[in-house]
Regions:
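Substrate/ligand-engaging "lid" and interaction regions
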Residues: 1-42, 46-339
Length: 339
């Protein structure tokens, strides 16, 4: 048993071993997603694979969605090259249930994976193509709080950021510079609306993403490296929004005991990879069952019905109330799961 499109053709063997498999036509979903993408996510890490990707899978299984996810990795390209591509973007999700049982799911909602690398001409051209699509509704991020910072611990501009300010959006080197360049491509395609949604677990995450993107828009406009209207586009809430979110999902690094459990089921090629950037990644993710994601409902190009997958949408003034409620609920849930 191998985790790949070919290996999953023998569905009976996987199901006999207790794995829940995708119930949708993945080839059809892949084709529709590539033609009319609605959601691209930056950050191919464990929380995305265990949470957002699984939510979309459930909605695909239920026929609520007809398109899947595209993921882009901008910090460690080897995650895509050594894990996503060899396994055809499939992941095994192992969930520890509140009653102590284990649930095993093959997640296949991610149908395309790319590196956010301006030196990879085909990948970056594809990213620009995605950003130019009318259908794109949301661009989401789990890149850690540090990923939004343009300065070092001393408050000095990071070298790549400083270089990007003067070189412009053609071939930026910094992570946020690349994202800003992609948003500029959407602006050039007709000032199309989109929600830029940080899903990192940090306070006022939407403001952090906005501040970083807006700084690039300001500097590029000052240096006459973009059209004069780009900064206004970034600051027009009818065109571009930066919703706040709150997220909680425990996804520790891939566990050796989980790996052994899967190997006993007969699954091959499960060995984790430690990349040159010291990222520890495996074909599987292990996670606790408890989770929540609350999103400020500010989507200028519309959004899918993600509330049917368990996500919560609210308005900014309701965040404090929901934060207290979700924290209490999650504390209760964790207390039960630890018994």
């Amino acid at each position: 048993m191998r985790l790949s499109a070919e290996g999953l053709k023998d569905r009976a063997k996987w199901e006999e071993a207790g794995y829940a498999l995708p119930k949708f036509d993945r080839e059809k979903v892949t084709e529709a997603t590539k033609e009319n993408p609605f959601w691209i996510h930056f950050g191919a890490g464990n929380i995305f694979r265990a949470f957002q990707a699984n939510v979309v899978q459930n909605l695909l299984n239920d026929g609520i969605l007809d398109r899947g996810l595209i993921v882009a990795e901008g910090f460690d390209y080897e995650i895509v090259e050594k894990m996503n591509h060899p396994h055809d973007d499939y992941t095994i999700l192992v969930t520890l249930k509140a009653d102590g049982n284990i649930e095993k799911t093959v997640v296949g909602s991610v149908v395309e994976s790319l590196t956010v690398n301006t030196e990879n001409a085909s990948d970056f051209a594809r990213l620009k193509e995605i950003f130019a699509k009318d259908s794109l509704q949301m661009v989401t991020f789990t890149i850690t709080e540090k990923g939004y910072s343009l300065v070092n611990g001393k408050g000095e501009l990071l070298p790549d950021v400083e270089a990007d300010f003067v070189s412009g959006p053609e071939a930026p080197k910094s992570y946020i510079g690349k994202v800003a360049a992609l948003l500029y491509a959407r602006y050039q395609a007709g000032e199309k609306p989109v929600a830029m949604v940080s899903m990192d677990n940090c306070s006022h995450n939407g403001d952090k993403l906005y501040a970083a993107i807006n700084t690039f828009a300001e500097k590029w406009e000052e240096n006459k490296l973009t059209d004069a209207g780009f900064r206004a586009y970034v600051n027009c809430k009818e065109k571009v929004t930066f919703p706040w979110t709150m997220i909680d999902k425990i996804t520790p690094r891939p566990d050796a005991s989980v790996e052994e459990l899967l190997k006993k089921d007969g699954i091959e090629e499960l060995d984790p990879v430690i990349t040159s950037k010291n990222t520890y990644v495996a074909p599987f993710v292990n996670a606790e069952e408890c989770e929540y994601l609350v999103i400020e409902d500010a989507f200028p190009n519309g959004r899918p019905e993600l509330e049917k997958g368990g996500l919560m949408f609210t308005y900014l003034q309701s965040f404090d109330i929901i934060l207290r409620e979700t924290n209490n609920e999650n504390h209760y849930c964790r207390s039960r799961s630890s018994r």
